[in-house]
Structures are given as structure tokens and as C-alpha cells.
Amino acid sequence: MKDVIIAAAVRTAVGKAPRGALRTMRPDDLAAFAINGALERVTQLDRSEIEDVILGCAMPEAEQGLNVARVASFRAGLPVECSAMTINRFCSSGLQSIAMAVDRIRGGGADVIVAGGVESMSFVPMGGNKPSLNPWLVESYPGSYLSMGLTAERVAKHYGITREQMDQFALESHRKAVAAIAAGRFEDEIVPVPVTNPAMDAKGKVKAAESLFQVDEGPRADTSLEALAKLKPVFHANGMVTAGNSSQMSDGAAAAVVMSAERAAQLGIPAMGRLIAFATAGCDPEEMGIGPVFAVPKALKMAGLALDQIGLIELNEAFAAQALAVIQVLGIDPGKVNVNGGAIALGHPLGCTGAKLTASLLREMPRRGVKYGMVTMCVGGGMGAAGILEVG
């Protein structure tokens, strides 16, 4: 079995959907920027050596359909000999793509693969443009199609999570993200993207305005506990889940260069880190958000580690309710979780998120002298995923 490294991992800044800076940027074009951004970090690597591109996408249709990974590989200028595939495990798709690349290289099926994810919720909304539910499931197992927000309400009720706890968690997400941006902690991982959007000039005329998008749009320095408390529940009249304590609709892309350690050494390419374990698990879809509770122990067992050996954790904040429940049930030290903010502030571009969090974690771990880190998230349909990273 081959030793496998992650040689580079980058992401775009995350735009707010559907009215943010990336609202007119096609997802296949956006993914190409991420792919090229990752490859620019490993200049020793000739593009002819890239054997495959694997991109995760949660809603692979319309502008992110037609095998968006293949389209993005063409837009990135990769050789036609480099194949590509799009994979979908909803919110864990970006992490899944990296895990698949690692497994493929470990087994000798390739030496160099670009893996990542892309999602434009501006172009393709949650659920897609034309949802078509299975009639049998609608009749016999309607919980399998329960909206994500209602699953969060159920998790909150089941695990005794209060509205106050959820709003406080959301506030901290914004505070940490704002501080991280001010400190420049995301600058190295972000690939600047040139965007052109309509804007009104001083005379009231609408003209095309060009800019370089390189700072996450979501974090709000002006939010407060009082402001969050005023928001009404979105999914249930008597519920607790609001727009303020849920992840944002987002646009973004991320990519990683995954290589055999042997080939990287030959080219003089250092390792950013290694994905040493990846696990998934199913759970009741009506409590989808609790998925990491079942995936994390499996990943830890695979890695031969205990939870207290994990120094940093990127736990995707689909909803404050489910993130708090996962922390509570697993007994995670909250001080290790989302130290630079999470999806409530920074956004959640579905199929991109797992690769995005990997890029962030691989940079924060060396800063804090952490050897082992974890990326984990709940997954629509009742699942959880977890990956363990090692640096040094």
C-alpha cells in the first residue's frame, strides 16, 4: 500500500447566495479557479501527471451538471487525458472526494489526483431546480424527505438544546470568523476570483463592475445576541431554528492535490498533511444532524486514536442545534471546535464544504502545534461523515 499525502489544499472565498459576489459566476468556472489555485501551489508537478479529477457536488444539475468535474477540468486547462468524475454524498461530498482520491492512490490506482468540491446555491438551490420525490417513500417513509430545518428542530428537542444556546453558539461563530479574517488566517488558503457583477454608478446607471473576490462574505461584526433573539423561527411556528442560528446558503469551490508520497518526494513537494481515516455512518433521517455521533467513533477506531488526541475539530455548523447536540453527546471539548468560526458565519456551500474545511484545518493545525485534526459533518438523508488529518 502506498503512503499518500495532501500536497496542496485551497478554496475560494465563500459568497452569499443568491445575491452575493459569486451570484453570476458559473460553478464550473468557479471550480476551475480552485483547481488552478491548488496546482499553482505545486509548481514542480507537471499537469500531464494528473490522472483524475474528483469533485463533490450536492446538487449536480443545470450549470453544475453534465459531470461538472469534467467541465471544470477543461476550464482549468487540464489535458484531455486527465479523466474526471463528479460524486455526491450531499454535505460531505468535498471530504468524500479527497477520501476517494487517497484510497485510489493508496491502492496503486493512480499517483496524482485533484479532489475537491463545488456548489453554487445561487444557480442551483437546495433540493435542485425540479425535485422529484419517490412516491413510495413519500407514502411509507415520509421522514426520509423531512426538511433539514425540521430535522434540526427534532434534534434540539430530543437533546434539550435551547434557543438561547443556539443563538449564543451562532454569535460565537460570527465573532470567531470576524477575528480570523481580521488576523488574516484565511488569506493563504483563499484563491482570489475575479468577478464581474452589475452595479449602479453615481449617476444611477447600471454598469458592469469588476472586482477581486477574496474575503468570505458571511461573517457579521455587527450581530448581537439581542439581534439574533429577535429573529423568528423559519421551519416551525413554535420552533427555535432561525436564519441566524442556521448555516448560510453559499457559493464556493475548493480543491486539493493528492499524491503518492513517493512521487511527491521525487519532485521535492512537501506534504501539508495526510488523511489517515475516513468513515461514514447512517442514522435516522428525521434527526439527520446527529450523524457525526456515529461517524466519528468509526473514524477514530480506524486511526487508532481516542477523541482526546484530536487537537482541533472542524464540525460543520449546518445548524447550531445539531452542532451543539454532537458536541454534547460525544463529549467534545468546545474549545477545540471551529476555532475560526463555522458555517453559520462562514457559509456552507454544500458539496464544497468538506474540501473547504480540509484546507482550513491543514493550516490551523501547524499554527497551534496540533498533530491530529478532524473534519466532520452531518449529511442529508440521515448520515454522518468524519475524516482525521495528520500533520508533521
Tell me the role of every PLM-derived stretch.
Residues 10-13, 56-60, 89-93, 117-122, ...:
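Acidic, glycine-rich active-site loops and adjacent beta-strand->loop/helix elements
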